[in-house]
Amino acid sequence: MKAKKSGKSSGDQVAGKPVSASRSEMAEVVLPAQTNPLGKLLGGHVMHLVDIAAAMAAHRHSNSYVVTASVDYIDFRNSVSLGEIVMLKSQVNRVFHTSMEVGVEVYSENVLTGECKHTTTAYVTFVAIDEKTHRPKPVRPLILETPDEKRRYEEAAERRKTRLALRYGT
């Protein structure tokens, strides 16, 4: 499926939505219950936050319920310390038929110095679910507006190819 160039619908087609409409951000302070004995945010908690931030972007794009289908990649680059602010930014990278890939970037901010660092990158695939039948449903096209969005769109196709090859052994 190719990205639509405009948001106009023709016939039965649902109008596309720009990537910017899916962008989501969330943040929270890292508390003691979320850290390991070294005072670092637990990786499992980061994964939980990634899933929530990614789902928000998928909901915004599809205007439907979504379920997590896979986490293709998660890279922990830097740790997040107790008392820091953890910030997550997500956006839909590509739409397939009933699924969509969402990219998530995680950052930490030291509240004393203001220093921000990129800590984690993840790619999560969601399936849109019909609210009545609870079955997968088609997702509206994605409108690409910037060179970065086009790059992410192309890279998502490669990740999908790898994911499907691993899943089906081809």
Each model region followed by its residue ranges:
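Generic structural detector for well-ordered beta-strands
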Residues: 27-30, 75, 125
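Hydrophobic beta-strand-centered segment that forms part of the acyl-chain substrate-binding groove
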Residues: 13, 19-21, 41, 52-89, ...
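A conserved, well-ordered hydrophobic junction motif at loop->secondary-structure transitions
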Residues: 35-48
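Short, ordered coil/turn segments that flank beta-strands lining enzyme active or ligand-binding pockets
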Residues: 33, 37, 131-132
